Curated annotation (Swiss-Prot):
The keyword Secreted applies. GO terms for cellular component: extracellular region. The modification Glutamine amide is found at Q38. Residues 27-51 are annotated as: Disordered. The gene is ghrl. This is Ghrelin. A lipid is attached at S29 (O-octanoyl serine). Pfam families: Motilin_assoc. O-octanoylated by GOAT/MBOAT4. O-octanoylation or O-decanoylation is essential for activity. The O-decanoylated form differs in the length of the carbon backbone of the carboxylic acid forming an ester bond with Ser-29. Keywords: Amidation, Cleavage on pair of basic residues, Hormone, Lipoprotein, Secreted, Signal. A lipid is attached at S29 (O-hexanoyl serine). It comes from Carassius auratus.
Length: 103
């Protein structure tokens, strides 16, 4: 009986230790170049260079649409509001309105 008990305790201990151990597998990257599988195609030579992106030319009739949540706050004195109020209102109507822009 004591031999069976000792064997069962050893078995449980080995099972518990196996849960704590991480398994590691060596992939093809660990192999030397002579042992690597040759299933891959060699890299293509003479690839075309990526052309530099062109800078877009902005024309007068181009329209840019943008919709994003944002917060806009402006602090003006009464004199500044008298001077810039109509222009500011026109800018806000153009930004927040659905009609085409008017300048």
């Amino acid at each position: 009986m004591p031999l069976r008990r000792r064997a069962s305790h050893m078995f449980v201990l080995l099972c518990a230790l196996s849960l704590c151990v991480e398994s590691v597998k060596g992939g093809t990257s660990f192999l030397s170049p002579a042992q690597k599988p040759q299933g891959r195609r060699p890299p293509r030579m003479g690839r075309r260079d990526v052309a530099e992106p062109e800078i877009p030319v902005i024309k007068e009739d181009d329209q840019f649409m943008m919709s994003a949540p944002f917060e806009l706050s402006v602090s003006l004195s009464e004199a500044e509001y008298e001077k810039y109020g109509p222009v500011l209102q026109k800018v806000l109507v153009n930004l927040l309105g659905d009609s085409p822009l008017e300048f």
